[in-house]
């Protein structure tokens, strides 16, 4: 008799950092029936392919202060556990994969109650609260950074790097009018944008443009001054669908330092200037970026350390030093595993797949 496909529930929600690694894994599991668990009105509504049934439950993260809202959130978390448990039973889910975030806690606990395997992928160098608290409840916590294991004593961990989507592994072309020989800077503030970073870049950009440098600036959707700079070599867009093509073409990136973005930079061997989001939980973007800076694959600066003049001069120094950029690119190539998604898929198969006859 034919093998019955294993049904997998992927719980990933909210930001590109949570969604893109999960999507990369899903691409490597054509033999699985995949269903998706998210939160209403979040990014997964537009990013998750229609081929994966999308279930949503309303949920929030805990507040730091004890109060009425915290109690309401606690009850919503408890309700979410039973909602996920019911979904697992109804849909006959055989295994669970999650990338952390609000949705992960109830999902991990529901999987334990259902006695099915659960794998958590922690992409950040400093593990999140859910990983620290519930990592021991998972069959395995797969890590994006090797050094993260030291923060998770007593947890079963394995390093697989962070998965990237297949297009990052295949040469891509751009539909932008940028000459092949032009020096290209790509500026990215992450899936949520970065107004302060955008302002800094726009103040610095005129000196770069005078040198004939091209700039693709991804501003996000919440920048009121996104259209304030106009130049034939400057392309400003909220987002760009073909990030693989952009990073492959870029001579230099100026970026926040979410784990997925850093992995993409490593896979595409893109030198970078990293400016961590200053309000990230537990300052995790700084510690992610520090790995790249210590490997001499990137320059790392706190946002409050930078001025437009300093950033402008730093970029022009790199522009005039192709040997330095080549060395940074070489170092970046050592910081990620190109077949991470395959390693993670193999891990999940070992933990979950059962023969049906």
UniProtKB/Swiss-Prot annotation:
Instruction: Give the membrane topology, semicolon-separated if more than one.
Output: Peripheral membrane protein
Tell me its EC number(s), please: 2.4.1.227
What positions does the entry give for UDP-N-acetyl-alpha-D-glucosamine binding? 15-17, 124, 165, 191, 285
**What Gene Ontology terms describe where this protein resides (cellular component)?**
plasma membrane
Q: Which domain of life is it from?
A: Bacteria
Sorted alphabetically, which CDD domains does this protein's record hold?
GT28_MurG (cd03785)
Biological process terms in GO annotation:
carbohydrate metabolic process; cell division; cell wall organization; lipid glycosylation; peptidoglycan biosynthetic process; regulation of cell shape
**Signal peptide coordinates:** none
Catalytic activity from the UniProt record: di-trans,octa-cis-undecaprenyl diphospho-N-acetyl-alpha-D-muramoyl-L-alanyl-D-glutamyl-meso-2,6-diaminopimeloyl-D-alanyl-D-alanine + UDP-N-acetyl-alpha-D-glucosamine = di-trans,octa-cis-undecaprenyl diphospho-[N-acetyl-alpha-D-glucosaminyl-(1->4)]-N-acetyl-alpha-D-muramoyl-L-alanyl-D-glutamyl-meso-2,6-diaminopimeloyl-D-alanyl-D-alanine + UDP + H(+)
Compartment annotation: Cell inner membrane
Q: Name the pathway it acts in.
A: Cell wall biogenesis; peptidoglycan biosynthesis
Keywords, A to Z, come to: Cell cycle, Cell division, Cell inner membrane, Cell membrane, Cell shape, Cell wall biogenesis/degradation, Glycosyltransferase, Membrane, Peptidoglycan synthesis, Transferase
> Which molecular function terms from Gene Ontology are attached?
UDP-N-acetyl-D-glucosamine:N-acetylmuramoyl-L-alanyl-D-glutamyl-meso-2,6-diaminopimelyl-D-alanyl-D-alanine-diphosphoundecaprenol 4-beta-N-acetylglucosaminlytransferase activity; undecaprenyldiphospho-muramoylpentapeptide beta-N-acetylglucosaminyltransferase activity
Name the family the entry cites: Belongs to the glycosyltransferase 28 family. MurG subfamily.
Q: What does this protein do?
A: Cell wall formation. Catalyzes the transfer of a GlcNAc subunit on undecaprenyl-pyrophosphoryl-MurNAc-pentapeptide (lipid intermediate I) to form undecaprenyl-pyrophosphoryl-MurNAc-(pentapeptide)GlcNAc (lipid intermediate II).
Q: What is this protein called?
A: UDP-N-acetylglucosamine--N-acetylmuramyl-(pentapeptide) pyrophosphoryl-undecaprenol N-acetylglucosamine transferase
Q: Which species is this UniProt entry from? A: Microcystis aeruginosa (strain NIES-843 / IAM M-2473)
